[in-house]
Amino acid sequence: MAIVNSWLICLVSIFSFVVRVEAATFCNATQACPEDKPCCSQYGECGTGQYCLNNCDVRYSFSHDSCMPVPICKSSSTKFKDYSSKLGNANTFLGNVSEADWLYTGDVLDYDDEESLILAMPKNSGGTVLSSTRAVWYGKVSARIKTSHLAGVVTGFILYSGAGDELDYEFVGADLETAQTNFYWESVLNYTNSANISTTDTFENYHTYELDWHEDYVTWSIDGVVGRTLYKNETYNATTQKYQYPQTPSKVDISIWPGGNSTNAPGTIAWSGGEINWDASDISNPGYYYAIVNEVNITCYDPPSDTKKNGTSAYVYTSSSEFLAKDIAITDDEVMMDSDEGSGLDPHKGATTSSTQKSSSSTATSSSKTSSDHSSSTKKSSKTSSTASSSSSSSSSSSSSSSTATKNGDKVVSSVSSSVTSQTQTTSSVSGSASSSTSSMSGNNAGANVAANWRLTVLCVILGYVL
């Protein structure tokens, strides 16, 4: 009887796990989020808390004010020397921009030899995303980076808005002398929008990639040389009678992600140069694929002259039917929630049952420093967020953790381990949009529930055998 009872407990645990996973509510052009989960995440799932930040999709949320107001642009220059400890964790961040200028999901490491930050993609992971906490509504954004390399590995530098507007640089690891540029308006896929710029080896060399975004035109430049110019008047669509030109406040994302993952759509795999090799030399040494970020500069431009202003702190959408520049206002609305139960509808929900927001930079899943084996004797630190990134989610019940970060040759080595032996990679299809190069975040509550249920299931199985 004890054995039967134990296995019944196991079955209940598994059933609970399945129910919780299947309870996810999705959002898209035909289905908006319900009021109890009002925010549509960038990846098409409804929820509260972090779902209401980080490019919350205003179009498919319960209402246009379900997403949190977006912190207004602030000109800045960020050098990523010894910067990992200053990063906020996107999975715990609740909107307090005084805590962090940049968020991460995935694995990041300081790289002292080049005074830079490594975005790492360990074997079978979804990659890493670095995101700004503030949005840019017209401005000049430049990033000095080294891309990754090899087939199936994609590096991205993009501006992306909660209305699906997008300005892109993407770099396919199989072609290191080409920067792919693209733009999207409200996520509309148009294959004629892309264009390439030739350059020198993007893996071996730092290049400064720049987006100079104005109301009526945008330029893409590499190392100060303009390689492409798009004019707003070129984007007019006679059918919709609208300019299909990126025009809404956008966050800055820099990422590395597995475009060649075998679970991706065939077109995505082909575009990224073929299936990714998870046993490539990089996976042995230094232990992951990587891109390197040295510096990002942001210069904010004035908003359109006819912008409605009732403050100076945040961008808000004023319409649930259109999401154009004319539908953006500048206000002093709150940009921070009190708990992961909050949303734009009620930022203070859950405040009485949750502790005061902690610094997101101090709640990273792990942080470690270790002496270098390299002759420079520099030190490294590494951080790993608690959810998979880059349009990928894992069935792993808990986060990976960086246990070491030592120098080996020219790159930092990170030992990444999982608390579950078996991981199943389920990467979503990418339809040509660089928005898929950013993190797929399931949220703290979902991650905690999955972890708790897996632990209970394993415990029950062990108990069943013992009894």
Curated annotation (Swiss-Prot):
GO cellular component, one term: fungal-type cell wall
Disulfide bond entries: C56-C67
Topology versus the membrane: Lipid-anchor; GPI-anchor
Family annotation (SUPFAM superfamilies): Concanavalin A-like lectins/glucanases (SSF49899)
Record's keyword terms, sorted: Cell wall, Cell wall biogenesis/degradation, Disulfide bond, Glycoprotein, Glycosidase, Glycosyltransferase, GPI-anchor, Hydrolase, Lipoprotein, Membrane, Secreted, Signal, Transferase
Domain GH16 residues, every copy: 63-280
Active-site residues, Swiss-Prot/TrEMBL: E166 (nucleophile), E170 (proton donor)
Annotated spans, Disordered: 337-444
Positions of glycan attachment: N28, N96, N190, N196, N233, N237, N261, N297, N310
Keyword Transferase applies: yes
Lipid-acceptor residues (GPI-anchor amidated asparagine): N445
PROSITE patterns for the chain: GH16_2 (PS51762)
Signal peptide: 1-23
Proregion positions: 446-467
Temperature optimum or stability note: Optimum temperature is 37 degrees Celsius.
Reactions the enzyme catalyzes: Random endo-hydrolysis of N-acetyl-beta-D-glucosaminide (1->4)-beta-linkages in chitin and chitodextrins
UniProt EC number: 3.2.1.14, 2.4.-.-
Keyword rRNA-binding: no
BP GO annotations: carbohydrate metabolic process; chitin metabolic process; fungal-type cell wall organization
Residues that, per the record, bind chitin: E170, W257, T268
Subcellular location, record wording: Secreted, Cell wall; Membrane
Post-translational modification: The GPI-anchor is attached to the protein in the endoplasmic reticulum and serves to target the protein to the cell surface. There, the glucosamine-inositol phospholipid moiety is cleaved off and the GPI-modified mannoprotein is covalently attached via its lipidless GPI glycan remnant to the 1,6-beta-glucan of the outer cell wall layer.
Superkingdom of origin: Eukaryota
Cited function: Dual chitinase/transglycosylase that plays a role in cell wall architecture. Chitinase and transglycosylase activities are coupled. Required for the polysaccharide cross-linking at the septa and the cell wall. More specifically, transfers chitin to both beta(1-3)- and beta(1-6)glucan in the cell wall. The minimal number of intact hexopyranose units required in the molecule of the acceptor oligosaccharide is two and the effectivity of the acceptor increased with the increasing length of its oligosaccharide chain.
Protein name: Congo red hypersensitive protein 2
Species per Swiss-Prot/TrEMBL record: Saccharomyces cerevisiae (strain ATCC 204508 / S288c)
